A protein has these predicted regions:
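Conserved active-site alpha-helix within GNAT-family acetyltransferase domains
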Residues: 91, 115-133, 139
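Loop/helix-junction capping segments adjacent to catalytic residues or to phosphate/diphosphate-binding pockets
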Residues: 69, 87, 118
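Acetyl-CoA-dependent GNAT
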Residues: 3, 7-70, 76, 94-96, ...
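Conserved GNAT acetyl-CoA-binding A-motif
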Residues: 102-113
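Hydrophobic adenine-recognition pocket in adenosine-nucleotide-binding enzymes
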Residues: 8, 78-80, 113
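Residue-level recognition of the GNAT/N-acetyltransferase active site
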Residues: 63, 81, 85, 114
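Conserved acetyl-CoA pyrophosphate-binding loop and the N-cap/start of the following alpha-helix
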Residues: 84, 88-96
Length: 141
């Protein structure tokens, strides 16, 4: 079965809350906050369906800098529930978000993932992403 990918709607808030909890742990995000985020329109949120069930999601953002001619994109989140993995959902989510980012004028897309997340790295590589040796630094404010 081929996954169906579409932009998330406010009707997906409940399943997005559940999937995000499976992915990130911590406290479940309230549906009202998810709906508010979906309504701002700043972030692309896509969902993948198999047999009419949402089984995964991915998020992307684009930004523009005077330093570069084209906008840059980033896939900021990607999760497919375990029972739906290896069925093409992640690749379909990537292709969908790449097309949406192209419409926004994005010329390059990056994805950050854990250094030892070999299944994700293999998926991204199979979709044409190239691994770079960069350091990620973070600071709490």
């Amino acid at each position: 079965m081929i996954p169906i990918v579409r932009l998330a709607t406010i009707e997906d808030a409940d399943v997005l809350s559940r999937l995000n909890y499976e992915f990130n742990g911590g406290d479940k995000r309230p549906e009202a906050e998810i709906i508010g985020s979906l309504n701002t329109g700043n972030e692309l949120v896509a969902v993948a369906e198999l047999r009419d069930e949402v089984v995964g999601f991915a998020c992307a953002q684009s930004s523009q800098s005077f330093c570069y001619a084209a906008s840059h994109g980033e896939i900021t989140e990607m999760y497919v529930q375990e029972s739906a993995r290896r069925k093409g959902a992640a690749a379909a989510l990537l292709a969908f978000l790449e097309a949406q980012l192209r419409l926004r004028g994005v010329g390059t897309v990056k994805i950050l993932t854990g250094r030892t997340n070999d299944p994700a790295i293999a998926t991204y590589a199979s979709c044409g992403y190239v691994k770079h040796d960069e350091a990620v630094l973070e600071k709490r404010l």
